[in-house]
Amino acid sequence: MDMDKRWIIILLLGLFSLNMSGQKLTFKKDGTFKIVQFTDMHYKHGNPKSDTTLLLIPRVLDAEKPDMVIFTGDIVTGKPVKEGWDAITKFVIDRKIPFAVTLGNHDHEQGVTREEIADFIISYPFNINRQSEISQGRVMDNVIPVYGSEKPLKEAALLYCFDTGAYSTIEGVSGYDWMTTKQIEWYREQSLHYTIKNNHHPLPALAYFHIALPEYRLAFNDEKNVRYGERKENECPPELNSGMFFSMKEMGDVMATFVGHDHVNDYIVNYHGIALAFGHFSGWKTTYTPEINGARIVVLKEGKREFDTWLHQLDGTIKYKVTFPADFANRDK
């Protein structure tokens, strides 16, 4: 394939990457864009053990007043599934807050496929997902542009959402699934498209997904890497490293990744100039839990490769409020 045809394909892929819901995300006039991440709610509709989850969501939304909400997997893990999603998303829909979803390894285990879950999530008002272009059983792999406050037709930042699947499908390899080759290729195409469109400068970007990359463990184990927050369990990444972190570093747009999956980890650590962060467990007693539930907040800053982030807990406590990269200069060995 010659170079001209390759650019045409990349540009077309970029056009298709725009969300189809009609929602358009834009930096506010003060140059900020705030995201609330909820993760691992393990919500079971009608189960009293999930009641605290339903207290958390409106408290955080009303206190933080975000521009967007992202749910990063293992959100509804009991029947009836559709009614569970209705209950969770009602809080953001009633407040007219755009939201996106990435699925975890448990969401599809209640007799509903990932594709069926994606279908009804995309049908919700204010949802900005769309069906993934990528096959291999992954759904809602999306890139979502955030447009400029003064240039509303120009992308100013990007939000990537990835489906990290569930469990290994390769015989002899145990544990959790990994980013596929097609997902990585798709990410590189999207990143290149927006970099070319931005006069060959990578846009500031964040990536949200459920299962941590193997680099999380490497990053935290290296004491020279500055970190904030707690690690109360060993990370549970896939056993195989398919190379997504390398591609993010090489493409140069992603500043940070935000995951869930490991319920009692809430740290953020600098690894080779990319922040690797956990959200805050947002569920309650339907699974193993930390002492209190909460959410992670991120505030992007227009025109800058930096962001603020903190944890907002059910009781209103704010923890680990930091700025990346300013607060993450690595220690000397």
Regions found by a protein language model. Give the residues of each.
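Bacterial Sec-dependent N-terminal signal peptides
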Residues: 1-23
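N-terminal active-site segment of His-dependent metallophosphoesterases
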Residues: 22-87, 91
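Acidic/histidine-rich helix-loop elements
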Residues: 36-54, 76-83, 109, 115, ...
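Binuclear metal-dependent phosphoesterase catalytic core
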Residues: 38, 145-147, 151-153, 244-251, ...
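Active-site environment of divalent metal-dependent phosphoester hydrolases
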Residues: 44-46, 77-80, 101-112, 167-170, ...
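Metal-dependent catalytic neighborhoods of phosphoester/phosphodiester hydrolases
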Residues: 48-49, 73-91, 108-126, 219, ...
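His/acidic metal-ligating clusters that form di-metal
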Residues: 65-67, 158-161, 173-266
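Extended active-site neighborhood of metal-dependent phosphoesterases/phosphodiesterases
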Residues: 86-199, 297-301
